């Protein structure tokens, strides 16, 4: 390895120039007549040559030749070009590169100045447009139906903007109303009363209102001599209906028979009527015999029910006594004729 780190290789880090240009003319020389032509791109990046600050634009190796031969008199080696020139077009035309680079830099500066002037002019035009009358939906300005013909160029587009900062002064237009919404439905009266109840007035006309019956006034109790109302008299029972019964072939009315008695306590006690033609004891049950019978603990205001006898059983008693020649005009003692099966618990004796 050498002192400069070139690994003893000739032209380390350099490319040898090609012998001749092989008849290629990739870039025409820039003459005075082409100074006003514009570069291929607006900013001229295609022709611009960026050179690092630590490499001069035309730096050659120390072994470059002068006057065709080096100082040693030996045949000159082909000139070597630094690798930075591979990235640009300097290796094609080394004699014109410096002049072309200066012309490009001058033309680029002129183009930037022109763009800045154009931007200022466009900004002033935008301010004028903003201060102008607002533009309605094209082509109508102001009143609808009146087209303005003295403005051939509208404020919507700037023809001289050259693709930058186009200003559109279009107001947001409302979306068009569909035809279905424009057609208003015809006014139709609502006759959907099918199945509903008729009005109250019609029902009142069909039916006559019921007249409430007048309530009978309550009779006030006639005051007595002292001014106090008289006490209600006990309700008297009506006459007994005749009950015809055939006893031993003789029609007999049992309603005329005197009330039977029970002498289980030693003193005869009248029995109570029970059911249809039956009788009930007022002093005895199957277990006790006392008068009056004790009060029922389960039913308030009622006593224990005594033994009972149905109408059929009483008829049998009458047939038996009539066969023995008993005078039925005398009260009958039912002490020995009560049923043996007990008493009815639900009979109330008052």
Swiss-Prot record:
- Tell me what organism the protein belongs to: Hordeum vulgare
Identification of the protein by name: Protein Barley B recombinant
User: Can you supply a Gene Ontology BP term from the record?
Assistant: regulation of DNA-templated transcription
Which residues are listed as membrane-spanning? none
Q: What tissues contain this protein?
A: Ubiquitously expressed.
Q: From start to end residue, where is composition biased (Basic and acidic residues)?
A: 179-192
Q: Where is this region: Disordered?
A: 43-74, 93-125, 137-241
Its keywords, alphabetically, are: DNA-binding, Nucleus, Transcription, Transcription regulation
| Compartments it resides in | Nucleus
């Amino acid at each position: 390895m050498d002192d400069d780190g070139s690994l003893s290789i000739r032209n380390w880090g350099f490319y040898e120039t090609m012998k001749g240009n092989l008849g290629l003319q990739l870039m025409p020389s820039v003459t005075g007549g082409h100074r006003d032509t514009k570069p291929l791109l607006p900013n001229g990046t295609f022709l611009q040559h960026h050179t690092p600050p630590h490499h001069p634009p035309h730096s050659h190796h120390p072994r470059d030749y002068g006057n065709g031969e080096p100082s040693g008199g030996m045949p000159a080696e082909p000139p070597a070009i630094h690798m930075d020139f591979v990235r640009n077009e300097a290796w094609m035309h080394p004699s014109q590169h410096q002049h072309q680079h200066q012309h490009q830099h001058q033309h680029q500066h002129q183009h930037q100045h022109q763009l800045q002037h154009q931007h200022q002019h466009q900004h002033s035009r935008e301010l004028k447009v903003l201060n102008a009358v607002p533009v309605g939906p094209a082509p109508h300005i102001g009143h609808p139906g009146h087209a303005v013909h003295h403005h051939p160029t509208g404020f919507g587009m700037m023809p001289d903007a050259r693709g930058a900062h186009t200003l559109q002064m279009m107001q947001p237009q409302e979306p068009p109303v569909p035809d279905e919404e424009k057609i208003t439905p015809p006014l139709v009266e609502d006759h959907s009363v099918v199945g509903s109840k008729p009005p109250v007035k019609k029902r009142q006309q069909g039916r006559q209102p019921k007249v409430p019956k007048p309530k009978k006034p309550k009779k006030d109790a006639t005051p007595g001599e002292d001014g106090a109302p008289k006490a209600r008299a006990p309700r008297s029972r009506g006459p007994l209906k005749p009950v015809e019964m055939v006893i031993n072939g003789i029609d007999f009315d049992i309603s005329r028979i005197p009330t039977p008695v029970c002498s289980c306590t030693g003193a005869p006690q009248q029995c109570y009527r029970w059911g249809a033609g039956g009788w009930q004891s007022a002093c005895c049950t199957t277990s006790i015999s006392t008068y009056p019978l004790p009060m029922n603990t389960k039913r308030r205001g009622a006593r224990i029910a005594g033994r009972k006898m149905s109408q059929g059983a009483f008829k049998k008693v009458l047939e038996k006594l009539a066969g023995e020649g008993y005078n039925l005009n005398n009260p009958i003692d039912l002490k020995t004729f009560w049923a043996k099966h007990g008493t009815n618990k639900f009979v109330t004796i008052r």
